[in-house]
Amino acid sequence: MTRVEPRRLVAALALLNLGVLVYCLCVLTTTGQTVDQGLMVSAESLSGDLAEICAEFVELVAPVSAAGAVLVVCLIAWRGNRIALALRAGIMTLGPIATAWILKYSLDRPNLDGLVQHNSFPSGTLTCVTAVVCAVYLATARRWRIVVAINGALLIVGTAVSVVVLKWHRPSDALGALLLVGCYALAVSAFPIRISSPRHSTLADPGNERLAQV
């Protein structure tokens, strides 16, 4: 374990405060609820054929997330320092998902815009997808992280757009999910660990040099 990176902890705290601000403005105020609801309705009306694409896209979210979880397990099994890496991946995956579930059922959504609806902040679907993507990113070797980042970003953006267009969630719900996972990602990455593949660990021992050449 290397030294803690305080700047990432500060950034995580900033995202946490921003998430609280989004909730207070978009859920606890009349103007915020009205604008938030209006944006969701407008997204649906302006989407056109996009709604069908989003519906098909969302159907892929569950299997892709499951595949991502399996990939994390495989990466942990293949790389060194498995305990630390498994702990990091577990916190990165289960932490945001559990927090989103607790927040969704504990936070209040007052009836301010005339629409009696249950609280949906933050989006559990988007939280799950984003958390799995971040876990895969953290468990992947550095040289492959750009590939994970690009494909993961496309998956996250597609999911965020889909849940709003399909009226599963309001824009603030999606933003809250992203801020929540971002907070966890920064906090977890603030405690870096040294990871090497089993092969590299073997070669690092001078006594194994002859064996490695066979």
Question: Can you say where each PLM-predicted feature lies in the sequence?
Answer:
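Membrane-interface helix-boundary motifs at transmembrane edges
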Residues: 2-5, 75-88, 138-147
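Alpha-helical transmembrane segments of integral membrane proteins
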Residues: 8-15, 84-92, 147-151, 173-176
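Membrane-water interface at transmembrane helix exits
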Residues: 26, 75, 100-108, 137, ...
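Transmembrane alpha-helix boundary/anchor motif
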Residues: 72, 94-102, 131, 186
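Membrane-embedded catalytic cores of phosphoryl/pyrophosphoryl-handling enzymes
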Residues: 113-213
